[in-house]
UniProtKB/Swiss-Prot annotation:
This reaction introduces a second double bond into the aromatic ring system. It is an enzyme of class 4 (lyase). Homotetramer. This is Chorismate synthase. The keyword Metal-binding does not apply. It comes from Pseudarthrobacter chlorophenolicus (strain ATCC 700700 / DSM 12829 / CIP 107037 / JCM 12360 / KCTC 9906 / NCIMB 13794 / A6). Its cofactor is FMNH2. HAMAP family: Chorismate_synth (MF_00300). Reduced FMN (FMNH(2)). The gene is aroC.
Length: 399
């Protein structure tokens, strides 16, 4: 069974993650993880923090000479800004006199709308928002990307590859019918300012971000994750919590600022007649069984069908708005403007990288559940044996 956990705070010394259940033989280095974290920092409209705060990756366990050993893999993502926060965020008690004159230690008593601040203070009994925002911060996704990189490397050994891209920023969207990016397109995608596969749309997105920046606004959008090379049968129809689409939706909804998820054509199918909503099963010109389309996004009945997996996640505009929204200062009870720390105008491209990591983690878990294997070679043999034993009358290929 594959499982993982993260720990750490936004301005703490480091973020940490442990992923257990990764078979032996997966090639993974700190360089792989650092490259993924660099992708997370990409995107037009990011804030100043992306420029001066670096991710320092250290693999602490489970890997020897660039190869997993079968034990838990532990990864630390160090924070180069830690010296500035060492006293404010120290785990051990600090002399109050040392903290008194530090501006960074000022109580955050004006909770920000759209964040976890206010309800977190209620739930955990805090009189200020610092303890809440330190853990609730999207900075935590750096560890998820690290864990997802390990999972993606495992999947890559099995011929499964993932791609994420931006399909909309605010009201600017990639037109329907445009080709989907493939694994060979990742370098070009990452070179685009907004990780958009359509150049004309990307230019319009850049203009939208510029306009929002001038107006002191923030923007959201939609990202899509594609998975190529999946075998049929991951997930199950037997119970709700074993359905692959259920697990993907939960994983994507767990990303900060994500407010909606769809699989395949998702919400658009609700406006169609039944005959135009599903994927007919036919024979192609070579006589092989295929689906005539992929409106389902590669999942039917809670199981992968062998076609390209396609899921989307909708990100709301960043809640830390430069213009500062109305709130209440909980120390005085008076109306106030919310705290405004530096923020991005748009972080949708980064959300795509995080979503890609979360999808990798879900798929890696589904693969280990279905096929097992103490080594990646054993997992690959098990997949081959499974596919070889599908009866000829049921054999199919992906689109």
């Amino acid at each position: 069974m594959l499982r993982w956990l993260t720990a750490g705070e936004s301005h703490g010394p480091a973020l940490m993650g442990i992923i257990e259940g990764v078979p032996a033989g997966v090639e993974i280095t700190s360089g792989h993880i650092a490259d993924s974290l660099a992708r997370r920092r990409l995107g037009y409209g990011r804030g100043a923090r992306m420029k001066f705060e670096q991710d320092v990756v250290t693999i602490l366990g489970g890997v020897r000479h660039g190869v997993t050993q079968g034990g838990p893999v532990a990864v630390q993502v160090g924070n180069t800004e830690w010296p500035k926060w060492e006293q404010i965020m120290a785990p051990d008690p600090v002399d109050p006199e040392l903290l008194a004159d530090q501006a960074r230690n000022a109580p955050l008593t004006r909770p920000r709308p759209g964040h976890a601040d206010f309800t977190g203070m209620q739930k955990y009994g805090f009189d200020e928002a610092r303890p809440v925002l330190e853990r609730a911060s999207a900075r935590e996704t750096a560890t998820r990307v690290a864990m997802g990189t390990v999972a993606a490397q495992f999947l890559k050994h099995l011929g499964i590859e993932l791609v994420s891209h931006t399909v909309s920023i605010a009201s600017v969207s990639v037109p329907d019918g445009r080709p989907l990016p493939e694994p060979a397109d990742v370098i070009a995608l990452d070179a685009d300012p907004l990780r958009c596969f359509d150049r004309e749309t990307s230019d319009a997105m850049v203009a939208e971000v510029d306009a929002a920046h001038k107006e002191g606004e923030t923007l959201g959008g939609v990202v899509e994750v594609l998975a190529y090379g999946l075998p049929p049968g991951l997930g199950s129809y037997v119970h709700w919590d074993r359905r692959l689409d259920s697990r993907l939706a939960a994983a994507l909804m767990g990303i900060q600022a994500i407010k909606g998820v769809e699989v395949g054509d998702g919400f658009r199918t609700a406006a169609r007649r039944g005959s135009a909503a599903h994927d007919e099963i036919v024979r192609d010109e070579d006589g092989r069984i295929v689906r005539a389309s992929n409106r389902a996004g590669g999942i039917e009945g809670g199981m992968s069908i062998g076609d390209v997996l396609r899921v989307r996640a909708a990100m709301k505009p960043i809640a830390t708005v430069p213009r500062a929204l109305k709130t209440i200062d909980v120390s005085t009870g008076e109306p106030a403007k919310a705290h405004h720390q530096r923020s991005d105008v748009c972080a949708v491209p980064a959300a795509g990288v995080v979503a890609e990591a979360m999808v990798a983690l879900v798929l890696a878990e589904a693969v280990t559940e279905k096929f097992g294997g103490d080594s990646v070679a054993e997992t690959a043999r098990n997949i081959k044996g499974y596919l070889d034993n599908i009866p000829a009358s049921l054999d199919s290929i992906g689109q």
